């Protein structure tokens, strides 16, 4: 509990992209997926735990409101809350819910303001179900105030944005920091929340988390954490700037948001050998940004303290105790979802300067060390595997999930019928993958039906809960495993775009599925419409060594002689975990630099996750992390809320028929977690104990579920029933996490 002012206080896709993809028999989207450091980040430039400008340990030493040393040129934008605003970019709650995206006057040359509006529109809708039946406008949304009351307003928030690059001196860091400060910021009760981008998204990738802070009159500290949607188009050598507009790499210089490290002479040869390729920030920066996600989140908080005081008119000459907003009197909550949630936890673990007071995250990506001694039990039965790093289990799913989704036991799964109709995929591709796995000795069954059942059981045995079974088809259909495995494989290995890791690359394709020139309109707007982890808007995953020439990976013919969705590429990515070649060793080193310690330094913390999560299975994230934290954090204040009938992609609920009748929005619980941590820090209200929250699906026909009500999404409680309690015990160096059925 924090003393405030001297008093004792009493979420990898976008909806429009997916709709367009299905209409065109293509596949595009991913909403969000899985922080750490290499042991050096916490001391990098002295910035990870407080840089000496504004930390709470100076105790009155004369310190001006000096911009942190790592912050470069700052751009300040002001929004009146009428024509434009912080939360909805002037669209209001109704505009965010509209199926019609904001217009762009010149499609091939959008302005920075147009791109910002389009970015906020797409990123909000990617992580939130914006349908009224799903709860938008009643349970959550810009027009629902901080106390949960439905208002008649449109939820627009006036205020200022401060934007900057942090600079480590290399000119290649490729990270953006942004602070939103509402005009209603409560300087008498100051608060900051972090909203590190989810997935591989750009700076507004966690705008739906920022919404909670803006409603609470808090500042919101964002960072893109070294990821983003705007690519380096190698054919034209053009790159995105900080605001998403594009120019040549030469003109951009060090102001580029991302430019692949390369020599012009080598680029020319590369373009001849592999034309029309694209480099992406997360995959191809060669910096393994994930190892510094905690650092970047902490830097965003430091930047926020300076920006708030600057907005309040404080310049120089004040002591720390005279600054109106300072760590000693400000509640700081590290928050976000998915990869951003993992970054928030990384920041809390690395927070040597006590900048962060509490943590509230949803479905965090948590890569855990293999040395943890944690046993997870469900209903009294021990689970065979838990606590694997993200790249491990995603590369495993990349082999088996496509085949597993063909199992007759999950024939009713959302999107499974699309495979049967060959919508965007080759006919019989699932059966071909099953047969190819058998030919490689990875499945023992001899019939397609038995192979699919065997693959599904392998998924369960490797940590996926049975509650995820009905999600495997949509995960496979939207190529989530190959996209995540390819991007993270490149990033962890610090691979150059020139390396074509596992003979995979990114490009637009023509009608014959071969690499083609990028559409000018799509490229100009990609920073706003993409998700940073191809396949994404107009960009596909390419198998460079397909029979007949480079081709879209899912359409390609590989060494099996069939269209098996490039099993060769999947096997190559998987083998990086155990291989001894240079690329494998680079990836293994990079992965070791991203692992979590489990020590939250006694900070009050809430993790919420859906039991059905098929992207980041609970057995590889929140559950074992709860045990690891109990082992290493002697003053642990962590609680874990596991929500039944909830999964990773709220944005799919109104998009894919069947999701609406099966799943409730996890966003409701992410906001409740923030409410609970804030109440704990502000008023001393205890956090709820770890528990399973049992929700009720909306039911009804797929695509026509009845409207959600509060009864569908009960709150967590301070006194959960014995059959709902999640228990953690540590004995003999082993932590046991017991989860009820």
UniProtKB/Swiss-Prot annotation:
From the Swiss-Prot or TrEMBL record, what is one GO molecular function term? Answer: hydroxybutyrate-dimer hydrolase activity
Q: Which UniProt keywords apply?
A: Hydrolase, Secreted, Signal
Identify the catalytic residues: 338
The record's principal subcellular location, in a coarse class, is secreted
Pathway it belongs to?
Lipid metabolism; butanoate metabolism
Xref: InterPro entries: OHBut_olig_hydro_put
BP terms from Gene Ontology? butyrate metabolic process
Q: What Enzyme Commission number(s) does the record list for this chain? A: 3.1.1.22
One Gene Ontology term, aspect cellular component: extracellular space
The source's domain of life comes to Bacteria
Where it sits in the cell: the answer is: Secreted
Pfam families this protein is in? 3HBOH
Q: So what does this thing catalyse?
A: (3R)-hydroxybutanoate dimer + H2O = 2 (R)-3-hydroxybutanoate + H(+)
Family note: Belongs to the D-(-)-3-hydroxybutyrate oligomer hydrolase family.
Main function: Participates in the degradation of poly-3-hydroxybutyrate (PHB). It works downstream of poly(3-hydroxybutyrate) depolymerase, hydrolyzing D(-)-3-hydroxybutyrate oligomers of various length (3HB-oligomers) into 3HB-monomers.
Please report the name of this protein according to its UniProt entry: D-(-)-3-hydroxybutyrate oligomer hydrolase
Q: Which organism is it from?
A: Ralstonia pickettii
